[in-house]
Amino acid sequence: HGSTKWCPSPDAAQKYACCHHGMATYVLGSENEMPWKFDRAYKSDITHVMDEMKLHYTDKYHVEYKISDMTGAEVTDIKLESSVVFEPGLGKYGEGRAWIEPVTSAVRIRKNLNDLSGDELILRNYIKQMTKDGSYQQIAAFHGLPAQCPSEDGTTVHTCCLHGMPTFPHWHRLYVALVEDELLSRGSRSGRPYWDWIDPFDRLPDFFNDATYYNSRTLHIESNPFFRGSMSFANTLTDRDAQDVIYNNH
């Protein structure tokens, strides 16, 4: 965050310790999930910050952090120890010393849902197959309801998602892989698409907001499985109530 280097003020009249913002991490959760736990620092790539400050990882600098809740109030009762880990790059220098990034993607490429081709939109058909045989609901239950994970003392049953725990990234990686393996077994050639909701938008994507879609295989207009789903344990359908605050919000 800071270093022994000094940066001039805009008018060059004073000098300040150089300070660059490195990263921000959000921890989610709800009253239905397992207890919120934050007992270690999250790992994040700060290579770009080191480059901007022209720092080598062995140089003298220090890292500062601030923990706040979603209202902006600072959380002061959690003390974490930060550290910097150097991991050599996996790429290589090519012709003209141009850096070549390594190929790390698998056969199943996860694309932005706004960039899906017409052929890839057939993903709806595979999801519909999963909803019909119950496999989609089984996987969804591992993330949400019905709650299946008991507390340590056995008095409470929580939903199994780990949003408020440091192990969440690992859990979610396995969860996405579980969905993609199910799609692959049904003939899907693409990975599970993602919605980049960080980009400002004025309406929900048609991919999951349209109630129906044209199925090019059956040549019929059919219900969109991403629009509404069945919850057999509650004998009801899912509903969506998008709040205006999400639109055009940076």
Swiss-Prot record:
Name this polypeptide is given: Hemocyanin, units C and D
InterPro entries: Di-copper_centre_dom_sf, Haemocyanin_beta-sandwich, Haemocyanin_C_sf, Tyrosinase/Hemocyanin, Tyrosinase_Cu-bd
Lineage, opening ranks: Eukaryota, Metazoa, Spiralia, Lophotrochozoa, Mollusca
Binding residues for Cu cation: 1, 21, 143, 172
Alphabetized UniProt keyword annotations: Copper, Disulfide bond, Metal-binding, Oxygen transport, Repeat, Thioether bond, Transport
Position(s), cross-link 2'-(S-cysteinyl)-histidine (Cys-His): 19-21, 161-163
GO molecular function, one term: metal ion binding
Description of how the protein assembles with itself and partners: Decamers of large identical subunits (390 kDa), each containing 8 globular oxygen-binding functional units.
Residue ranges, annotated region (Unit C): 1-106
Function text: Hemocyanins are copper-containing oxygen carriers occurring freely dissolved in the hemolymph of many mollusks and arthropods.
Names of required cofactors: Cu(2+)
Recorded family membership: Belongs to the tyrosinase family. Hemocyanin subfamily.
UniProt remark on cofactor binding: Binds 2 copper ions per heterodimer.
Disulfide bonds: 7-18, 149-160
Residue ranges of the region described as Unit D: 107-250
